[in-house]
Design a protein with these regions (language model features):
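Amphipathic alpha-helical recognition patches that constitute DNA-binding helices
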Residues: 15, 89, 134
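Acetyl-CoA-dependent GNAT
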Residues: 3, 7-11, 18-31, 37-85, ...
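Conserved beta-strand-loop-alpha-helix junction that forms the acyl-donor binding cleft
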Residues: 100, 126-135, 152-154
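Conserved GNAT acetyl-CoA-binding A-motif
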Residues: 109, 116-127
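Conserved acetyl-CoA-binding loop-helix of GNAT-fold acetyltransferases
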Residues: 92-95, 101-114, 137, 141
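Conserved active-site alpha-helix within GNAT-family acetyltransferase domains
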Residues: 106, 118, 130-148
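Residues that form or flank phosphate/diphosphate-binding pockets in enzymes
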Residues: 85, 103, 134
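A generic structural signal for well-ordered alpha-helical segments enriched in polar/charged residues
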Residues: 22-25, 114, 118
């Protein structure tokens, strides 16, 4: 079994869109998932938004593969801050359930970190839903620490 990651191409867009739909389906029922879906999840048509990222010099889109088959993807973008510094923001990082725990997430995060460091980012941010312990642990094992908690008050039933 050969694992790897590489920059995405336009021919990968249908598969990345399929994986994006899978992550939206996986996260939506979790605590905080409904608001995440409405606010942060990629909107349809997914292929159009992903294609724009491929053409954006301030973004990097990766695919993770096992034996040449795409089983994951990641997206990071540069955010220019008020003080003139640059922050790398991981918008997506996802590996299909059956392909987890073999190091693909680590390959992608390492690539994204290198890419952001080369662009003189002061750091990187990533989001994990409350209670999604596996995601939190993954980021912590990669050297991330919490820097902000978002509090939410829901109205209605």
């Amino acid at each position: 079994m050969e694992e790897g990651c590489r920059p995405a191409s336009t021919t990968d867009l249908p598969r990345i869109a399929e994986l994006t739909r899978a992550v939206i389906e996986e996260l939506s029922p979790m605590r905080g998932g409904a608001v995440w879906k409405a606010r942060e999840a990629r909107p349809e048509p997914l292929e159009d938004g992903l294609a724009a990222l491929l053409d954006n010099a301030d973004a990097r889109v990766l695919v993770a593969t096992i034996d040449g088959t795409i089983v994951g993807y990641a997206v990071v973008r540069l955010e220019y801050l008020a003080d003139g510094s640059i922050l790398g923001v991981i918008d997506d990082i996802f590996v299909e359930e059956g392909a987890r725990q073999v190091g693909l997430g680590e390959l992608m995060i390492d690539d994204l970190m290198t890419w952001c460091e080369e662009r003189k980012c002061v750091g990187m941010d990533a989001m994990a839903l409350p209670g999604h312990r596996a995601t939190k642990n993954f980021f912590e094992e990669s050297g991330f620490t919490a820097r902000q908690l978002v509090m939410h008050h829901h109205f209605g039933s």
